[in-house]
Amino acid sequence: KPNTAMDMNLDVRDIGKLLGHLGQPDSVKGGTANLNGKLSWVGNPYDFTPTILTGNFRLEAIKGQFLQVSSSGAGKLLSLISLQALPRRITLDFRDVFSSGFAFDDMAGSFVIDKGLMATNDFLINGTAAIVTMEGSVNLVEENQNLRVKVIPAASDTVAIASTLLGGPVVGVVSYLLQKLLKNPFGQITAFQYAITGNWD
């Protein structure tokens, strides 16, 4: 049976325009990026499916802004990266971050894919309103995730903790919330940590 291997080094001058051509218009504004790595799968090039995909790649991007990401197709993966997949009751805590779109100065991460399971331990978004780190795995086949996310607001003293954050039924992708928040010596909240598991829906 044939095997397909691909070495890639892709420079993107406008992330937003590229995603528009790929069926995700108005999901990202501007931004430049570089994507490089190696991917392979058993079969011909046209046999490509996430279930047989293996390899590794690195993504680096600068000066872009996440807008309203579609919840269908590849938009589901984008919504994870931009944190829009977090349930509404959690994003309420970061309305200053998400209200007009999440702008980033730079974004980078290394990823390994094994038969559709994509993992990272160093994904970081340096945003103008917050710094976000993410590690864990996303299953592109079964469309679920097991991620640990830390959000560090740029102006933590202006971010209020919604009372609903710790109350009510847990819906959507969050199965466990770390209730303990990191604090600096002055008692101000400096970071929010979440464990996100479950289906994309």
Locations of regions flagged by a protein language model:
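Small-residue helix/turn framework positions
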Residues: 1-197
